[in-house]
Amino acid sequence: MPSKCCTIFMTRLICRQSDLVISCAGVAPVDGAFLITADMIKPGACVIDVGFRRIGRGQFAGDVDFAAVSAVAEWITPNPGGTGPMTVVALMQNVIDAARYRIGLARAEYPV
């Protein structure tokens, strides 16, 4: 069996057993298919879709088939619009911390 088939098989098997699935591949779909589909998700799991790809002119999608997987998963992030805003916040915080470090100021503590 080719290694690609083994990789796909193992990915499906591992995802099906997982309580948490985080997908961040951002790969183009084959024949319009999503990387993560409902049959790969354990009922009640949490699915975080970080992957981001262009699917057409001005159209974007994540790695996860949101419509199908949301019927199986207990929690799921939409994409686009799910994890992106949090990524921007984290990046901006890192820029501020780097600037403070550069001029000799201590890293500011922020309440969680």
Question: Each PLM stretch: what is its role?
Answer:
Residues 1:
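Internal active-site segments that recognize and position negatively charged phosphoryl groups
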